[in-house]
Amino acid sequence: MDRRSRAHQWRRARHNYNDLCPPIGRRAATALLWLSCSIALLRALASSNARAQQRAAQRRSFLNAHHRSAAAAAAAQVLPESSESESDHEHEEAEPELARPECLEYDQDDYETETDSETEPESDIQSETEFETEPETEPETAPTTEPETEPEDERGPRGATFNQSLTQRLHALKLQSADASPRRAQPTTQEPESASEGEEPQREPLDEDPRDPEESEERREANRQPRRCKTRRPARRRDQSPESPPRKGPIPIRRH
């Protein structure tokens, strides 16, 4: 019974509700409500978009004006600075040209390479040994056909003239070696020419060294001083393997 009474009550309530607010009216009311809400939202969106566009236009105009003014000011500052920097640069370029020394043109022979500097002391040692051994071996190999009982009066003037000729030749050799480059300057040894076939050649005075120590020291100092104008290029060293032959042979000694 209770269940039937409850179902009957629910039916009455529905009928009463439908009578008070029919379904057609309810549907129309919901449609109007949705329309009004959507219209309000659209109006709000439109107004917000219009305001955003106005603000963006204002910002663009302000930024354009600011950038133009900043660019004009920067250009006005850069122009005098660039003119001043160009004038300073021209002055700086003119000063080194005035202060630059006149470089002398040196010969290529004056520039020593590493290989030349290494071979020079070896050639000096070889020339010294040959210079020391030659005067000792010469009197032994020279012909000794002249008798020992030759009078001293005949030897005197001949020996004096021979010594004078030797000193003159040594002096000329010194001048030639001073004029020549240090690379080509080699110690020279002389073989004294016998005045006659039967006369023994006299030994050269050992005190007179054809290589003057003062001139050699001056050359070394001149070679050690750096040249500011032209730099010397370092010579490339090749791999000195035991299979490869030596680069240069023994330096020949000039004989006069």
Curated annotation (Swiss-Prot):
Biased-composition ranges for Acidic residues? 104-139, 206-216
Record's Pfam families?
NESP55 (PF06390)
What are the BP-aspect GO terms? adenylate cyclase-activating adrenergic receptor signaling pathway; adenylate cyclase-activating dopamine receptor signaling pathway; adenylate cyclase-activating G protein-coupled receptor signaling pathway; adenylate cyclase-activating serotonin receptor signaling pathway; bone development; cartilage development; cellular response to glucagon stimulus; cognition
Q: Which GO terms describe its molecular function?
A: adenylate cyclase activator activity; adenylate cyclase regulator activity; alpha-tubulin binding; beta-2 adrenergic receptor binding; corticotropin-releasing hormone receptor 1 binding; D1 dopamine receptor binding; G protein activity; G-protein alpha-subunit binding
Q: Which residues fall in a compositionally biased region of kind Basic residues?
A: 225-236
Q: Where in the cell is it found?
A: Cytoplasmic vesicle, Secretory vesicle, Synaptic vesicle; Secreted
Give the UniProt keywords, A-Z: Cleavage on pair of basic residues, Cytoplasmic vesicle, Glycoprotein, Proteoglycan, Secreted, Signal, Synapse
Cleaved signal peptide residues: 1-46
Q: How is it modified after translation?
A: Binds keratan sulfate chains. May be proteolytically processed to give rise to a number of active peptides.
Region annotation (Disordered) ranges: 61-256
| Entry keyword annotation includes Signal | yes
Q: Where is the composition biased (Basic and acidic residues)?
A: 86-103
- Which family, according to the similarity comment? Belongs to the NESP55 family.
Q: What else is known?
A: The GNAS locus is imprinted in a complex manner, giving rise to distinct paternally, maternally and biallelically expressed proteins. The XLas isoforms are paternally derived, the Gnas isoforms are biallelically derived and the Nesp55 isoforms are maternally derived.
The protein's name in its UniProt record: Neuroendocrine secretory protein 55
- Write down the species: Rattus norvegicus
